[in-house]
């Protein structure tokens, strides 16, 4: 939860988490008083008490292999940052073995564009366009329901894949960017391609092995292209 405004919502979210079997609550700059949070948590007070607190979004993000952001505000195909998938499509998250964070924004205006850009996936909950925003705890309930539902559907057949960690993903993205830069497309197009690639790989929940394989391909491709360029000079 990023900068939640009301302690009551923190407690309600903790209660929802306990309903669905989740225990690890993380908050960025929560309100100083925790009285309402404990009051609304009912039997989930322990989740509030054990919550991890971070001072900034970036500090929080360093602790996760993959971040799934949430937003009621979506955009068309031209805005890559706010082009989400439906909440019903995040089921693959239960098929991975890694540290995944679900990121919920402020009650009044949600996550900023900069924060969304730092997430690997953006998810939205389909609602009526006349009133798109859900109460924070209701949003959490819908997302957690989808995850638990998918886990129960897969049941004993669920085989978890080792998710690429943050370092592996960052290295892969950097090597991809270096490869794209060889084509001298300009800063704007390079950044756009980089963002697109990050979104695609985020939605794919790439494994560590897949990530390292792609990293090797990008690195070798860049080396060969640069070698060919030098030979043609």
State what each model feature region is.
Residues 1-233:
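Post-transcriptional modification and biogenesis factors for structured RNAs
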């Amino acid at each position: 939860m990023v900068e939640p405004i009301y302690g009551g919502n923190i407690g309600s979210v903790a209660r929802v988490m306990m309903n669905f079997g989740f225990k690890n609550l993380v908050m960025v700059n929560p309100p100083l008083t925790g009285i309402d949070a404990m009051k609304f948590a009912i039997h989930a007070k322990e989740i509030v008490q054990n919550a991890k607190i971070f001072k900034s979004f970036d500090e929080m993000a360093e602790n996760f292999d993959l971040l799934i952001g949430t937003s009621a505000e979506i955009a068309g195909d031209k805005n890559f940052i706010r082009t989400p998938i439906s909440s019903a499509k995040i089921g693959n998250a239960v098929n991975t073995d890694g540290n995944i964070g679900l990121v919920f924004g402020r009650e009044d205006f949600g996550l900023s564009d900069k924060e969304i850009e730092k997430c690997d996936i953006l998810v939205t909950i389909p609602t009526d366009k006349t009133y798109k925003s859900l109460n924070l705890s209701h949003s959490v309930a819908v997302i957690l329901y989808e995850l638990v539902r998918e886990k129960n559907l897969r049941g004993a057949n669920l085989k978890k894949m080792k998710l690429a960690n943050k370092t592996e993903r960052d290295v892969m993205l950097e090597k991809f960017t270096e490869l794209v830069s060889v084509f001298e497309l300009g800063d704007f197009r390079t950044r756009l391609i980089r963002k697109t690639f990050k979104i695609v790989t985020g939605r794919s929940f790439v494994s560590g092995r897949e990530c390292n394989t792609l990293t090797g391909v990008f690195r070798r491709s860049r080396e060969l292209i640069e070698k060919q360029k030098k030979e043609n000079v």
